Amino acid sequence: MPDAQLYFLSDQYYIDFQDDKLMKNKDTIDGIAHSRPCFLAFPDAKNPAIYWLVPISSRYEKYQKIAQAKIEKYGRCNTIRFGTVLGRNAAFLIQNMCPVTAPYLTAYINKKAEPVRLDDRVVADITKNAREVLAIARRGAKVIFPDVFKIYQALEASL
């Protein structure tokens, strides 16, 4: 699976892993269902068949305020990061990330039928912070909303 590329999650993922803390799969705009959110994927450190997906939100200002409040309270915020996607400011919601395997993914393709890719510096920042947040979560802190370790175990068992 290529690095720095964006993906959508399949409907089947939400059927197989019912967790109300997962970001919902489709938004309806003007009566039309759209695949949302899109995700940045990076491989798991232990199992290369499993990827971690970080949802991307266009609600930049909303998440800037939330991140700023966390910085004021804790001195830093690595559960929400910021970058650009297709020339627009975006929030990367590490706090909402989830594990997945390739069959549940669909590449985000642009109008030229090319995969949408991100700047390597943005990807490096998101991946570094996501791995730190995973390490914190493994020590028992509730810093990720979905039950990612339950989903991870189910994915491992299915491989």
Q: What positions do the PLM features span?
A:
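Compact nucleic-acid interaction/catalytic patches
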Residues: I29-S35, K46-L86
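Secondary-structure boundary elements
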Residues: M1, P43-P48
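Short beta-strand-centered aromatic/proline hotspots
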Residues: C38-F42
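An N-terminal domain-cap segment
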Residues: M1, F8-H34
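Residue-level detector of flexible, active-site-proximal loop/helix-junction positions
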Residues: Y13, Y60, Y104
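A broad, low-specificity signal marking well-ordered, structured residues that form hydrophobic/aromatic
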Residues: Q5-Y7, Y51, F92-C98
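C-terminal terminal-subdomain/extension
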Residues: A67-L159
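Residues at the C-termini of beta-strands that transition into short coil/loop
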Residues: S10, S57, T101
